[in-house]
């Protein structure tokens, strides 16, 4: 979906998307992903404004009979892989992650490395406009350790769960988190 993290998903746009999908004979039963703004993950003072937009987005999804939202709470990137096409012994390819490779790269080199393997495909969380701010994001996340990130996730979930319960929305966190 083309709405920036933290921005409201308007009900009219959700409805139009749902109609377009259903006109093709399909049904939307869930959404991946209503992206979470970094201010929420970091715990910045402005996070409540973005949480309010998230709550209103959930209400709009619920009103459109969409009852599952997959999301992630990963810092900096939507997801991180160090290889997009690691060759397996049988010749197939898989995504791969190496902490050693992450530790050895600075953010710009990492972006260049991943982008070079992407064949021009822009991956979620790796958009060029986001990458222009990557050093700033790394600085903002510098003091967010595992405990702080989990505390911010708990704060977020406690804020959104009442509306999830009201609209029977199941929140499905990405398994990498």
Model-derived regions, located:
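N-terminal pre-domain/capping segments
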Residues: 1-168, 172
């Amino acid at each position: 979906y083309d709405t920036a993290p933290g921005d409201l998903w308007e009900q009219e746009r959700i409805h139009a998307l749902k109609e377009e999908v259903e006109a093709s004979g399909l049904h939307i039963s869930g959404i991946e992903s209503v992206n979470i703004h970094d201010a929420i993950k970091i715990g910045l003072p402005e996070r409540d404004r973005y949480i309010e937009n998230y709550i209103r987005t959930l209400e709009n999804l619920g009103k459109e009979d969409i009852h599952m939202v997959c999301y992630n709470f990963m810092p900096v990137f939507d997801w991180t892989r160090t290889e997009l096409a690691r060759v397996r012994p049988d010749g197939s390819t898989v995504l791969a992650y190496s902490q050693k490779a992450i530790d050895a790269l600075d953010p710009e080199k990492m972006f260049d490395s991943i982008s070079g393997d992407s064949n021009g495909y822009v991956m979620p969380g790796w958009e060029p406009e986001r990458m222009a701010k990557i050093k700033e994001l790394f600085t903002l996340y510098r003091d967010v350790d595992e405990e702080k990130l989990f505390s911010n996730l708990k704060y977020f979930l406690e804020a959104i769960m009442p509306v999830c319960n009201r609209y029977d929305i199941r929140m499905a966190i990405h398994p990498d988190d």
